[in-house]
Amino acid sequence: MEVMKYEVVIKTDLKDRPKDHELSAALILADYFKSDVVFLRPQLDKTPDIDVNGMSWEIKSPKGNGKKTIDNNFRTARKQSLNIIMDLRRIKMHQSKAKARIDFFLSTPHHFKKVLIITKSNKIVEIL
């Protein structure tokens, strides 16, 4: 039986091409969704990063260790898409602490439809 392969499609130019961590996240997501991942060309400042099966997603890859790092990333992301992927591979705080901050933020009123986490071990966890 042949293994299905999925593509990461970049519809952009050099000026606004995806960063390396976004590309590696897209490869993980293509395998998770069993679908092609299309990087969307930025129309304005606040547009989602990718499209998977007609659903727009914003990828956030926080790097900090501060108390508000996760909260600030969610606040920025909600202006871009209702579906968020929080990539924890670059974050300086411990993964369990970051997960606790995500759970705390999502316990307050929000408008997100879907929230996924990419763990430091490249696994995807569905939160919402």
PLM features per residue range, with description:
Residues 1-36, 63-128:
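Metal-dependent nuclease catalytic core centered on acidic motifs
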Residues 20, 24, 45, 54:
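Short, well-structured alpha-helical interface segments that form or flank functional binding sites
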Residues 30-49:
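A short acidic/basic microdomain associated with nuclease active sites
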Residues 40-41, 59, 87-88:
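Short His-Asn-centered micro-motif
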Residues 47-52, 125-127:
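Short, solvent-exposed polar/charged micro-motifs at secondary-structure junctions
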Residues 50-63:
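Conserved catalytic cores of phosphodiester-cleaving nucleases, focusing on short active-site segments
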